[in-house]
Amino acid sequence: MLVAYDIALDLVRALRPVVAQLRRYSPEAADQVERAASSIVLNLAEGRRRHGRDPRRFWDMAHGSAGEIRGALDLADAWGWQVDSAQARVLLDRELALLWGLTRRSRAKDASLLASGGTARPRQLGCGPSVRGSVAAWPASCG
């Protein structure tokens, strides 16, 4: 079991009162936090069932969702909304660190494989990583 998964569930529990407070100011922001928190848990659950390079894709999505929650909490502060998010922020910081470690470790593993002459993924003519946002992605046509 991933520690990040357990922390993600704790984060959801800590966010319940935060979401209720957010809803008074912005139902849309509250819904976004709910979706992002659920996305973290669901992507970690799916990623841990995958093998090879595939888990990193789910960990990257979970990391992005955690960043969305941070943005929503920062936005609430910027608007001056009275939202007590201290406990949730502590768990969120831990979750972000764990997810960064998971994605970073996976990237380092790919880099060491490439440095040793191996390939991280079989190459086809015209295939290679492209960068979409901050996440390296393989074209769908590449096997």
Features from the language model and the residues they span:
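Amphipathic alpha-helical assembly/interaction segments
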Residues: 1-143
